[in-house]
Every structure is written in C-alpha cells, then in structure tokens.
C-alpha cells in the first residue's frame, strides 16, 4: 500500500493517515458534503467536487485551481478537456499533483488570463483583500467552496470576504449554505482520532499531546459548526 501521508505535513498527514487506513486510499483533502448519515466519506468528498464542477463553463475553458491539494480535481479537469493549471506555495502538494502546477503564492502569481479561478478550501489561507486584488487581474469569475467564520477570531469572516470581493468589482451570482452537509466531516475524524492514537504516534511521530490537541480541536470545530459560528458555503462571484 502506498503511504503518501508519510511525506506530507501536519496536520494534513493525520487526516490522510486516517483516510488511508479507514477507506483504503485518499483522493481528496477537502470536506465532504453528506446527504445521509451513512454516506461514505469518499462519496461525500466526491459530491463536493461534483458540485464545484457543475458550476463550470464547458471545456475547453481556461481554469486555475488555486491550492491543488493532492491534484485529484486538477487531473479530473484535464481529463474533461479543460485547459487547467494549478498553483500552490507548497512544493509537496505540487509534487503529488504532478500536473501543470506552479509553485508560487497566489498573491504574486502573474499568469492568465483565465475564465474561472477555483478555490476549493484554499481561500481561507489567503488574505481576502489580496486574493480579490489579484483575482481581478486574472479572471472575471471566482468560484469558492470554503468555510468562513461569522464573527472575527476563528478565521477569515464571511462579511470581510464579501466586502473584499465587492471592493474589487465582484458580485455574488450564487450562494449556497452547505454548513450542515459539511459538518459531519468534522465528526468523521473526531470519532476516529482516539482509535488511531497509537498508530498516529508510531507512524507519524506524533506525541500524545498533539493527538489530545487534535481531539480537543475536533470538539471545538464541531461545536462551531452546529452553533453557526462557522459556515461552509459555495460562492460564485463575477465581475
């Protein structure tokens, strides 16, 4: 069995480890969208990608996948006939993606033009003002699937994100709240972390304290979602 999590970084290597041993493989790093409690995590993650793909113009539109993850979505876009490229500041992600991937921060990326920019859980790592200032120069459309905080202090806030978009000439063409479909992803890992404690320590070199921290954070994140402090949304922004 290939064990790619051994070459990845914390904490994503933890989630990759659990997916590999629970599901037999890991294709995605993003949240799943659960329709039923008995959905598999793989089916839920695939549903998330399908939702994103359903909003795209037909091939051969030119797309930039910002973040790339493991490269699964980028490879699929290429197979579908899109002129698709990826960008990530992380060399390990780029190596795993093995596609047309530039290793660079999005904020200074000088490429394009593109028809659509895709942010599948990558917008949260980029300052919102910088994101839309750069997006304005690259494409007329930004498609986002990500989590947001409602109040400041957890991560980028939804209001600040929309304000930055508007300041750079983007308007919301579509918005879908998927929070309750995404939340079971947190519960999936939260339920399995205690079971994999010793394996994570042995395989990844984690400490008991790190595993305890992940378990505690899982509880906090679950509460954030079910209390409405965190939301998960699809946003289609155009200018």
What label would you give each PLM region?
Residues 154-169, 175-176:
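Short alpha-helix
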Residues 1-20:
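N-terminal auxiliary segments of SAM/dcSAM-dependent transferases
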Residues 180-239:
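Conserved Class I S-adenosyl-L-methionine
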Residues 130-142:
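A short glycine-rich, Lys/Arg-flanked "PGG" loop and its adjoining helix->strand segment in the class I
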Residues 42-59:
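Conserved alpha-helix/loop element of class I SAM-dependent methyltransferases that forms part
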Residues 64, 68-107:
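Class I SAM-dependent methyltransferase SAM/SAH-binding core
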Residues 118:
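A conserved beta-strand element that flanks and buttresses the S-adenosyl-L-methionine
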Residues 140-151:
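Conserved beta-strand signature within the Rossmann-like core of class I S-adenosyl-L-methionine
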């Amino acid at each position: 069995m290939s064990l790619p999590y051994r070459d990845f970084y914390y904490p994503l290597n933890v989630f990759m480890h659990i997916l590999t041993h629970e599901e037999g493989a890991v294709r995605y790093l993003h949240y799943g969208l659960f329709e039923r409690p008995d959905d598999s995590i793989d089916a839920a993650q695939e549903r998330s990608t399908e939702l994103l793909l359903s909003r795209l113009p037909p091939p051969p539109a030119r797309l930039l996948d910002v973040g790339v993850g493991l490269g699964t979505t980028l490879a699929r876009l290429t197979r579908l006939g899109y002129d698709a490229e990826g960008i990530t500041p992380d060399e390990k992600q780029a190596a795993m993606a093995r596609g047309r991937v530039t290793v660079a921060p999005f904020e200074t990326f000088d490429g394009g033009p593109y028809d659509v920019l895709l942010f599948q859980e990558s917008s949260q790592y980029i300052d919102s003002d910088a994101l839309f200032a750069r997006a304005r120069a690259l494409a007329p459309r930004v498609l986002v699937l990500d989590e947001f905080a409602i109040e400041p202090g957890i991560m980028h806030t939804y209001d600040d994100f929309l304000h930055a978009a508007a300041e750079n000439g983007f308007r919301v063409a579509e918005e879908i709240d998927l929070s309750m479909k995404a939340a079971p992803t947190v519960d999936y890992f939260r339920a399995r972390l205690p079971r994999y404690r010793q394996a994570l320590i042995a395989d990844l070199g984690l400490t008991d304290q790190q595993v305890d921290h992940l378990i505690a954070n899982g509880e906090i994140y679950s509460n954030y979602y079910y209390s409405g402090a965190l939301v998960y949304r699809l946003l289609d922004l155009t200018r």
